[in-house]
């Protein structure tokens, strides 16, 4: 992997690079920044937002957000595609992960510090973050569901967590006892995940606070930042420098700023995003960690995929608060790199197992695809922020691609097992193992690095908050499923939107729009990028102007029970990849609506050679049939497409002359495909997304 950065080409001096220009300008000045970040007395941190009104992220006061988030609690997902997943998440996944956390010693790590457990420390350096991500999932779940037992269980856990906090504010169960001298040292910052853990602590604390106003974990997290971090670390002459090591704290600090209104947290996020020249980093670290240098000097996505996605989230959050144009320029270039060179058709990212990293442009292997669940989630989170900054549907299309495919595949249908990686081809007879899944089972109930399971849980718990946004002009409708939104326009006028649909299996969507008082405003309807033909009607009258991959603006005076009817084109598309994607040459992928499909061995009529799917060929130019099977995999649409099975006679040598004929037999067959998200729910079996084709 080539490194485009020379470590000193972008560092002229510490004084020149320690303070981001957007911070050190008219808004505050260098002296004010150093005062804030040196731990000098500041106004007390207090409630800034109305905790009941915050969305997945709180953009209510973000000056450069074109769209404002709608609270998670303001949207109810009703019976339909996502309700099944969310019920499983609430009733099985979140409680099951609680039991896993206990049985694998994650809570014992806290309890041992207060004498409540004699168990030794267990797990890797980032084990604390597992508790915090699970707490964040609970926080989002409690925003839409009254679960007294879950609330009390979580509150008891949080009390035990907070009881371990030291007088300085420090709270981490790994860097204690004989490891205490390692706190925030150079090697610890780059690889020790201290700031990563506090970032997840902040996010979990904020989600719990927004669930019911409970500040227990939030106040503890603030004490960590105010009491331990700010007085000792930052750009000041008597402070030590900071490098995130694993980006995460940046977006958490911006969200803390949004929650409290205290700008010192925003400034600290900007300082970390900018990097500190006093901290020496090797070129390989700069690539892998995706931090430590000015974010605006980045030109491409590289290194650890989750780190880079989280860095982009933090940078976009910073832009939404500051409007720094250099950040937007960089983010736009990185997004182009993502969508043109690095994005799997399933919405997954991160091609390489080594380093869990991005590969070179167009390096998108299938069987060896890593596609970590956390990376797809981070990519979705980043696009959510880019959407808020721009109001452009191209970002929503990417969100939908990831959500329905590369994220949804990460959790089993029963909610009890998870994918760490999400390959696009699988052969159980081959070596499909990796360091997190040594037995190659693909889905497991637990990983010692268990970042993905609670990450998936928090994503599905927060899903209602992704359906809508508001602006000064009206309301944006991003995602489609049976749901009800009860919120208000920017002028305070109440608004209810009821969705009825069988999306994503069918393309018809009906909205009932009911403002509390008749009012003129714009309704922005997303026309998906995969839908070539679209119909939109309001109260039976056709509306023109619907363009694929854009928001259709319907501006009118709306009254109670106005009806919007949309019909999207659910034609099955056979997709080809750019020829530069070497593994996909001569192959096609099937997509219908937002769903990407795959072949899995149990569904094929021909069982000969059942260990793999290498002989199956799809016929281009023939029709695909779509059928809903209510009894298969909790109810899915299946595709049937004409094809053949090629059976080639064995050849004695590994290589042979091209002129030498090899006997091959072609057997007509019908290929059957299922949604990619549903694979590996019947045990490990051969699977492939990209299928060889023959033009007929």
Feature roles, as predicted:
Residues 1-5:
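Secretory targeting signals
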Residues 9-35:
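N-terminal export signals
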Residues 36-130, 155-176:
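Low-complexity, Ser/Thr/Pro/Gly-enriched N-terminal "stalk/linker" regions
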Residues 43-52, 269, 331, 397-405, ...:
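C-terminal beta-rich recognition modules with glycine/proline-rich loops and embedded aromatic residues
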Residues 82-84, 135-148, 199-214, 249-261, ...:
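Well-ordered alpha-helical scaffold segments within catalytic/enzyme domains
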Residues 113-131, 182-197, 230-246, 282-285, ...:
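Solvent-exposed loop and edge beta-strand segments that line ligand/cofactor-binding
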Residues 114, 120-122, 126, 141-282:
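Extended ligand-binding groove/face enriched in aromatic
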Residues 256-280, 300, 307-344, 376-378, ...:
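Active-site neighborhood of glycoside hydrolase catalytic domains
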């Amino acid at each position: 992997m080539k490194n485009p950065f020379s470590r000193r080409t972008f560092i002229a001096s510490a004084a020149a690079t320690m303070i981001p220009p957007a911070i050190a300008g008219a808004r505050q000045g260098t002296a004010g920044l150093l005062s804030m970040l040196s731990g000098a007395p500041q106004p007390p941190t207090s409630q800034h937002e109305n905790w009941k009104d915050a969305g997945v992220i709180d953009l209510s006061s973000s000056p450069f957000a074109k769209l404002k988030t709608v609270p998670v609690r303001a949207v109810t997902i009703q019976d339909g595609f996502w309700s099944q997943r969310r019920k499983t998440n609430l009733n099985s996944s979140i409680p099951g992960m609680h039991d896993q956390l206990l049985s694998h010693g994650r809570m014992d790590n806290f309890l041992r510090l207060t004498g409540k457990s004699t168990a030794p420390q267990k797990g890797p350096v980032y084990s604390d973050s597992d508790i915090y991500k699970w707490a964040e999932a609970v926080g989002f779940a409690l925003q839409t569901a009254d679960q007294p037992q879950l609330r009390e269980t979580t509150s008891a856990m949080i009390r035990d967590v907070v009881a371990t906090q030291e007088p300085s504010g420090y709270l981490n169960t790994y860097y204690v006892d004989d490891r205490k001298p390692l706190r925030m040292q150079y090697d610890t910052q780059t690889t020790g995940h201290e700031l990563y853990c506090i970032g997840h602590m902040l996010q979990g604390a904020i989600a719990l606070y927004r669930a019911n106003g409970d500040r227990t974990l939030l106040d503890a997290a603030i004490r960590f930042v105010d009491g331990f971090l700010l007085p000792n670390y930052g750009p000041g002459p008597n402070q030590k420098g900071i490098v995130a090591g694993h980006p995460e704290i940046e977006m958490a600090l911006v969200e803390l700023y949004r929650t409290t209104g205290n700008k010192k947290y925003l400034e600290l996020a900007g300082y970390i995003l900018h990097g500190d020249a006093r901290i020496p980093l090797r070129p390989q670290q700069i690539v892998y960690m995706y931090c430590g240098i000015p974010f605006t000097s980045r030109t491409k996505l590289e290194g650890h995929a989750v780190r880079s996605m989280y860095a982009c989230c933090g940078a976009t959050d910073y832009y939404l608060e500051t409007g720094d144009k250099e950040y937007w320029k960089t983010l736009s270039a990185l997004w182009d790199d993502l969508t043109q060179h690095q994005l799997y058709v399933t919405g997954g990212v991160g091609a390489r197992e080594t380093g869990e990293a991005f590969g070179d442009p167009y390096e998108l292997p299938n069987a060896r695809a890593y596609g970590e669940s956390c990376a797809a989630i981070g990519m979705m989170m980043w696009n959510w922020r880019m959407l808020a900054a721009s109001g452009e549907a191209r970002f929503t299309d990417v969100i939908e691609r990831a959500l329905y495919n590369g994220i949804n595949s990460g959790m089993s249908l029963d909610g009890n097992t998870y994918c760490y990686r999400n390959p696009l081809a699988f052969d159980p007879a081959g070596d499909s193992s990796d360091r997190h899944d040594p037995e190659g089972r693909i889905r497991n109930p637990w990983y010692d690095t268990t970042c993905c399971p609670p990450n998936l849980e928090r994503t599905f718990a927060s899903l209602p908050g992704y359906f809508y946004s508001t602006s000064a002009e009206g309301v944006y409708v991003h995602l489609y499923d049976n749901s009800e939104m009860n919120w208000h326009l920017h002028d305070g006028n109440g608004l209810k939107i009821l969705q009825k649909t069988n999306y994503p299996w069918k393309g018809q969507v009906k909205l009932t729009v009911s403002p509390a008082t008749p009012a003129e405003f714009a309704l922005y309807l997303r026309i998906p990028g995969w839908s070539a033909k679209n119909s939109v009607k309001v109260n039976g009258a056709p509306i023109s102007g619907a363009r694929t991959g854009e928001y259709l603006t319907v501006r009118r005076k709306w009254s109670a029970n106005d009806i919007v009817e949309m019909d999207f084109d659910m034609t099955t598309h056979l997709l080809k990849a750019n020829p530069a994607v070497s593994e996909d040459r001569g192959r096609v992928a099937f997509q219908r609506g937002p769903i990407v499909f795959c072949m899995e061995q149990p569904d094929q009529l021909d069982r000969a050679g059942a260990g793999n799917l290498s002989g199956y060929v799809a016929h281009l130019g023939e029709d695909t049939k779509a059928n809903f099977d209510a009894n298969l995999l909790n109810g899915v649409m299946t595709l049937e497409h004409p094809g053949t099975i090629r059976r080639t006679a064995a050849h004695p040598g590994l290589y042979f002359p091209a002129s030498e004929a090899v006997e091959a037999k072609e057997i007509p067959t019908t290929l059957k495909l299922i949604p990619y998200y549903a694979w590996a729910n019947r045990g490990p079996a051969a699977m492939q997304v990209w299928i060889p084709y023959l033009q007929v």
